[in-house]
Amino acid sequence: MATALSGTGPAYILLFMEAMIDAGVHLGFSRRIANELVLQTMKGTVEYARQSPRHPATLRNEVTSPGGTTAEALYHMEKGGLRTVVSRAIWAAYQRSLALGAGNEARMRRIDPAADE
């Protein structure tokens, strides 16, 4: 289970970072500046979450002003199904890890017939 959440997690975060960087470039930032802004945002956010005992949803609400830019962006992310896509992707990774594990068990039985005893 951890593989689906943590083992493959860095790729999820990096994809999200890519999307943010690309959006920054679309807004007019150089790729270098957009990359640095996203890196600093990620670093600061992780530190903020690490230092707080509060749930991430509470922290998100604390940095979201009603009717503000963050609220607007989050509305569009939710409307676009971000949570559903992430949840389905992690479930698919979990299912894939089970399938790969089953394949490994079958290969081990072929290599070591005593494993069936």
Residue spans for each PLM region:
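NAD(P)-dependent Rossmann-like dehydrogenase/reductase catalytic/cofactor-binding core
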Residues: 35, 39-117
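Anionic-ligand binding region
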Residues: 1-36
